[in-house]
A protein has these predicted regions:
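Metal- or metallocofactor-binding catalytic centers and their adjacent structured scaffolds
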Residues: 33-38, 67-140
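Conserved, mostly hydrophobic/aromatic
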Residues: 65, 71, 128, 141, ...
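Structured beta-strand/loop patches that form or line metal/cofactor-binding pockets in enzymes
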Residues: 31-84, 357-361
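N-terminal secretory signal peptides
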Residues: 1-4
C-alpha cells in the first residue's frame, strides 16, 4: 500500500520514537499511573535589551510552567516570545491542553512523538518534557539525573554572556560579571563587523586579563567572504586581539567547518547550529568540525538524544558546551544539572538576577547554586529539585493563566 507524504512522515516519526525510546527515559509502573491534572502559566517580562547580529530584543516574555500530577508539581520555563509586553500566554500555551488527563508516561511519549513528527517545535517540546521529567523524579523520590545515569558531580564553570555593540556598555556588563565572580569563562556576542568585533575583543580582554577564556558567538554573522582563507584570516585577527574561540562564525557546511578548523589551528571553533536537533546531530556530528560543541536549549527537542549527543562529544575527546536561551528561571537548574552530569566544559544557562529577580524571589528549593564562578550541586533533590512559592510568583508575574 502506498503512503502519501503526510502518512509517511507520521509513520517515520513513530518509527523513530519506538527506535530511540529507552528504559532510563521511560516511566516505572508507579509514575505511569499518575496523570496530568493541571497546567499553570506565569509570564515574566524581561526588559533588558539583548543585541544579536540578526536582531535586537528590546524585551522578552518568559513563561514559567507548572504541571501538576497528583501531589507532585513539575516546573519548567519557556522563552515564549520577544518584543511584546502584552503577549497572549493562554493562546501560546494552548498546545499543552493536549496533555490534559494523560498518564505521565503517555504524556512524555506524546511530546516526543509530536516533535519527531515535526508537529511541535523544540521550544514547545522541551519545556513540557522538562516539567514531566521533573515529576518523574519526584514520584520516584530520586534526582532525575540519577534516573538518567548521569553520574559526574564536579562543578562546572558558569559562562557570563555580554550582548552589547557599544564598548562602554559592554564594559558595564563586564563589571557585573566581575561582581558576580563569573570571569573564568565569558562570551561576547559579535556582529560580523570586523571593526566592532575587534574593538569589543580588545576592550574585554584588557578588562578581564589573560586568565579568562574569552569566546564569541557571531550567530553566523560573517557573510562577506568568498574563500575560507578570508574567513580564517578574520578569525586569526580576533585571536590576536585576545579571543580564544568562536561559535558559529558563518553559515558553513560540514566540510567547511573541518577545513576552517584546520586553517585556524589552535583557535577553537564551536559548532552550534549543526548540532540541532539532537536526534539529527547524532548522525551529523564530526569531531573534526571544532574543539568544542554546543548543546543549545530550545533546539534539542528531545532529551534522550541530547544526553546521547553529549556523551558522544565527550567520547570523541572534545569539549562540551551547554548553551543558553536567555533563560532566567526554572530551566536554568535543569541545564546546569545536565552540564554537571555530563561533565561539560562550561554552562551558559545560568540565572540572571541583573535582568530579572522574580525567580530568586520565589524559588524555595533547588538542587544547584553558583559558587566561586561555578555551578555546583548544593543538594540533589528529587526530580530537578525546584520548589516555588506560588503565592508570591502569582503576585510578581506579569500574567497568570491556569489552562485547566
Amino acid at each position: 500500500m502506498e503512503l502519501n507524504r503526510r502518512q509517511f512522515t507520521g509513520s517515520l516519526g513513530m518509527l523513530m520514537l519506538s527506535t530511540i525510546s529507552g528504559n532510563i527515559f521511560s516511566c516505572s509502573t508507579k509514575e505511569a499511573n499518575s496523570k496530568v491534572d493541571s497546567i499553570s502559566l506565569y509570564m515574566v517580562n524581561v526588559t533588558k535589551s539583548r543585541n544579536f547580529s540578526h536582531s535586537t530584543w528590546h524585551n522578552r516574555q518568559h513563561v514559567f510552567i507548572k504541571i501538576q500530577a497528583g501531589r507532585h508539581a513539575g516546573w519548567a520555563e519557556a522563552l515564549a516570545n520577544k518584543n511584546d509586553l502584552d503577549f497572549d500566554i493562554a493562546k501560546w500555551g494552548s498546545y499543552l491542553n493536549e496533555l490534559n488527563g494523560m498518564p505521565i508516561a503517555k504524556a512524555i511519549e506524546h511530546c516526543r512523538s509530536k516533535f519527531l513528527q515535526k508537529k511541535w517545535n523544540a521550544k514547545m517540546t522541551e519545556p513540557a518534557l522538562i516539567a514531566l521529567y521533573d515529576i518523574v523524579g519526584k514520584i520516584e523520590n530520586k534526582p532525575t539525573i540519577e534516573l538518567w545515569e548521569l553520574n559526574k558531580r564536579e562543578p562546572v564553570p558558569g559562562l557570563f554572556c555580554i550582548l552589547e555593540k557599544n564598548v562602554d556598555q559592554a564594559l558595564v556588563q563586564a563589571q557585573i560579571a566581575k561582581d558576580q565572580n563569573l570571569t573564568s569563562h565569558v562570551k561576547i556576542k559579535m556582529f560580523g563587523d570586523v571593526e566592532i568585533d575587534l574593538a569589543l575583543t580588545v576592550a574585554l580582554r584588557q578588562f578581564f586579563g589573560e586568565d579568562s577564556f574569552l569566546m564569541a558567538d557571531a550567530n553566523r554573522g560573517y557573510k562577506k567572504w568568498e574563500r575560507l582563507d578570508e574567513l580564517a584570516l578574520r578569525m586569526k585577527d580576533l585571536q590576536k586581539a585576545g579571543l580564544n574561540a568562536m561559535e558559529d562564525p558563518a553559515e558553513l557546511t560540514t566540510e567547511q567547518w573541518i577545513e576552517l578548523q584546520n586553517k585556524v589551528g589552535d583557535f577553537s571553533l564551536i559548532p552550534d547550529r549543526p548540532m540541532r536537533p539532537a536526534h539529527k546531530a547524532l548522525d551529523l556530528f564530526n569531531q573534526d568540525m571544532g574543539h568544542y560543541f554546543n548543546i543549545h536549549p530550545d533546539t534539542m527537542g528531545t532529551f534522550k538524544e541530547a544526553v546521547k549527543l553529549g556523551k558522544k562529544i565527550k567520547a570523541a575527546d572534545r569539549g562540551l558546551m551547554i548553551g543558553d536561551s536567555s533563560l532566567i528561571g526554572p530551566a536554568c537548574t535543569f541545564w546546569q544539572q545536565l552540564a554537571i552530569g555530563l561533565g561539560a566544559s562550561w554552562v551558559e544557562a545560568i540565572e540572571k538576577p541583573q535582568e530579572s529577580n522574580v525567580f530568586q524571589e520565589c524559588v524555595t528549593n533547588m538542587s544547584t547554586k553558583i559558587a566561586n564562578g561555578k555551578t555546583e550541586i548544593s543538594a540533589l533533590r528529587p526530580g530537578f529539585g525546584i520548589e516555588m512559592d506560588e503565592v508570591k510568583l502569582k503576585a510578581l508575574a506579569d500574567k497568570y493563566v491556569k489552562l485547566y
